[in-house]
Regions:
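Short, conserved catalytic or adaptor-binding loops enriched in Gly and charged residues
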Residues: 8-16, 58, 75-77, 169-173
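Gly/Thr-rich phosphate-binding beta-strand-loop-beta motif of the actin/hexokinase/Hsp70
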Residues: 79-103
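ASCE P-loop NTPase helicase motor core
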Residues: 1-41
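A residue-level signal for conserved active-site and pocket-lining positions in enzyme catalytic cores
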Residues: 23, 55, 89, 99, ...
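Mg2+-dependent endonuclease catalytic cores in nucleic-acid-processing enzymes, primarily RNase H-like
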Residues: 100-207, 227-230
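ATPase catalytic-site recognition across NTP-hydrolyzing enzymes
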Residues: 29-88
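Conserved beta-strand scaffold positions in the cores of enzyme catalytic domains, especially
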Residues: 18-22, 85, 156
Length: 233
């Protein structure tokens, strides 16, 4: 099961033959120096992912060969972020449609999972996006769907995809600090599982595996369209 310790989701074993005792520095505050406590607080602010693993004790669960190895979790999406817009990936039966709010603070990319569900019609996506009043950068694979959402009053634009566009988006994301809101469970899961593909000999190649990536694809469309100017004319 998951329990929350100082805002960090920590896995606790529930196996009947296991007694899992999880302690942190909060259980020993009276014996810790002010210098140590300040170091821990600084880590919490400046490197929340390290704080989660090293201090609070969340299990390291980034997959081997992970594309994104350094990213953090924050409580809230910053209201002062710039270039705020949605990245939108479309799915239906088996794949979810993902609506990810994205924004920039200095060289940091902030991400907030607003919707992540299967079986959504264009009318459902419109209901999700309309209250925000933000620009949307979307997958260009289904022009009909983009037109329907546009007709619903949404400022939606199709991203320009082509040879090398996947890696271009990934490279730009890796050049930035990435922070994901703590409520964005599906997006966090994708970032942990998103790995480079392997060739027939088991060697990693410069191409990610194409699964568990719907939220990440939505973010990549935002990066391509809003930050790199790759919008279909």
């Amino acid at each position: 099961k998951l329990v929350e310790i100082d805002g960090v989701q920590v896995q606790i074993s529930t196996h009947p033959n296991v007694l899992h005792i999880h302690t942190t520095y909060f259980d020993n505050l009276e014996n810790l120096s002010p210098e140590f406590l300040k170091e821990v607080e600084d880590m919490k602010v400046n490197n929340p992912e390290k704080y989660a693993h090293v201090v609070i004790g969340r299990w390291a669960d980034v997959a081997e060969g992970a594309v994104f190895k350094k990213w953090g979790i924050v409580d809230e999406f910053p209201a002062w972020a710039k270039k705020i817009a949605f990245g939108q990936d479309f799915g239906y039966t088996h794949d979810p449609s993902a609506s990810i709010r994205c924004g920039i603070v200095d060289n940091a990319l902030y991400l907030d999972e607003v919707d992540y569900r299967t079986g959504l019609l264009s009318s459902d996506i419109i209901k999700t996006l309309r209250p925000w009043g933000l620009k949307v950068i979307a997958d260009s694979a289904d022009p009909r769907l983009i037109q329907e959402i546009h007709n619903g009053g949404i400022k939606i634009y199709a991203v320009e995809k082509g040879a090398g566009s996947i890696n271009a988006g990934i490279d730009k994301m890796k050049d930035m600090e990435i922070y994901i809101t703590k409520r964005s469970y599906n997006l966090q899961s994708e970032f942990r599982k998103y790995v480079w593909a392997k060739d027939k000999d088991g060697n990693y190649i410069n191409e990610p595996e194409d699964h568990d990536n719907h939220g990440i694809d939505a973010v990549r469309y935002y990066v391509l369209g809003e930050l790199l100017g790759k919008i279909q004319k």
